Amino acid sequence: MSRRTSSRGSSRREAMVGNVPIRSLPKVSLHDHLDGGLRASTVFELAQELDVPLPADNPRALGEWFAESASKGTLEEYLDTFHLTLAVMQTADNLTRIAREFVEDLANDGVIYGEVRWAPELHTDGGLTMAEAVQAVQDGIEEGEDAADEAGHAIRVSQILTAMRQANRSLEVAKLAVDFREDGVVGFDLAGPEQGFPVSRHAEALSYLAGEFFPVSLHAGEAEGPESIRDALITGRALRIGHGVRIAEDLETIETEDDEVRVRFGDLARWVRDREIPLELSPSSNLQTGATAAWGASLEDHPFDLLYQLGFCVTVNTDNRLMSRTTLTRELSQLVETFEYDLDDLEQFQLNAAAATFLPVELREELIDLITEGFNR
């Protein structure tokens, strides 16, 4: 795709593409964790109420602590920061509040549809059952949708229930997801440490979901390479790949005699590209966790643009807004600055995401129409 001149957005001023504020554009968020999307001020307030020790003495400093602690270069160290957010997410009231604020923050960022993923099994220390936790989150989502609507911003948010790869409750979580399929839950996920905990450990749960025709998006290709993605597709029947950035390891760059550069596809990469299997790329998070270390340490080294130019179905996501101190607007702005994308490129990313949602086809088509209309304006 040809590149056109784009104004370079600034994190200190309104991020722009051309003369259009990126925040004003309709967006779709596919990969956004509830326990990574809290406001630092909310964590600070709730932790004080619960006497949870804090590493900072004010909300701003706490936000800086999350970002710095999550930027150590490995997924394991990135995940260590979640002990603090999880500590304040063990009651129905807190879960409802956090989910409501989560939706409000998405709406303020121009998101018109989002899928929030989280692991109910990590929210039972205060005595909640997993089903009670799911209902508390759903209550908060609906409150957030109503508040956004009153403020003039229509938004819909669905839940994706996550099971932890290192635990043994995936079948229980899978059945819970199916039980709530008419009450806000649209998908299932596996998250947590990727190395040493393959998708195949959860074959029973994933077979159950396949039998129920229930959509699956699995974390893969983040801390491990192409074999993890292969496992997600074959064992997990995944319809989307959470991150999936390391699919680029199945591509080989070849210089020809006339100094042209060509790319040779491995079988897996060609399958993912040709079948248009969506990749839930999260640029800032990928840099923090070291998922892109094989290519470099800056955004310009991220294989996002390579995958996009080669025709992969790329989508742009935040992963964990608190840990990455980011928003979808900021992620898109950084891509515009780095790769000189224009309005057409940003629209394509949103259309990819809209088509990849776990909504019924009629609602996906409505979402695509809303995006097209919004970008045309």
What residues fall within each predicted segment?
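Short HxH-centered metal-ligating active-site micro-motif
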Residues: 219
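Metal-cofactor-binding active-site regions of metalloenzymes
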Residues: 2-4, 12-214, 222-240, 246-377
